Amino acid sequence: MHIYEVIMLNTEYDGEDHFVIAKSKQRAKNIVIDYYEQENDGYMSPVTDHDLAVNGPVEPEDYAEEMLLN
């Protein structure tokens, strides 16, 4: 498992970046899409694969400061 930063590219949505623990970049995107689907009462997520970019895997020692992972 790795930590990935999933970045929202489409400013139409909340614009929040998400840190996700996943096996791959694609799984990290899918987890975020599933999150937005749940926020949409289980209906198809308005957020698509094309709305997201993924950085990572992120190594915790790459960060100089402590931070909240959302």
PLM segments and residue spans:
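Short, mixed-charge low-complexity intrinsically disordered segments
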Residues: 34-70
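Residues marking helix boundaries in flexible regions
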Residues: 4, 22, 32-34, 59
